[in-house]
Amino acid sequence: MTPSLSAFLSSVILAVVVIVVPISAALVFVSTTDKIVRS
């Protein structure tokens, strides 16, 4: 694996961690605290 490819993969993983984790945590938090039943 070339250094540029490994750097690209690490940046993609970092972006996923920075973006997806807070959004999923917020969705789980809202879904657990929101008591409105949706059909």
UniProtKB/Swiss-Prot annotation:
It is a single-pass membrane protein. It is found in: Plastid, Chloroplast thylakoid membrane. It comes from the Eukaryota. This is Photosystem II reaction center protein X. Belongs to the PsbX family. Type 1 subfamily. It comes from Emiliania huxleyi (Coccolithophore). Pfam families: PsbX. PSII is composed of 1 copy each of membrane proteins PsbA, PsbB, PsbC, PsbD, PsbE, PsbF, PsbH, PsbI, PsbJ, PsbK, PsbL, PsbM, PsbT, PsbX, PsbY, PsbZ, Psb30/Ycf12, at least 3 peripheral proteins of the oxygen-evolving complex and a large number of cofactors. It forms dimeric complexes. Its main location: plastid. Involved in the binding and/or turnover of quinones at the Q(B) site of photosystem II (PSII). PSII is a light-driven water plastoquinone oxidoreductase, using light energy to abstract electrons from H(2)O, generating a proton gradient subsequently used for ATP formation. Keywords: Chloroplast, Membrane, Photosynthesis, Photosystem II, Plastid, Thylakoid, Transmembrane, Transmembrane helix. One of its GO terms (cellular component) is photosystem II. The gene is psbX. The chain crosses the membrane at residues 12-32. One of its GO terms (biological process) is photosynthesis.
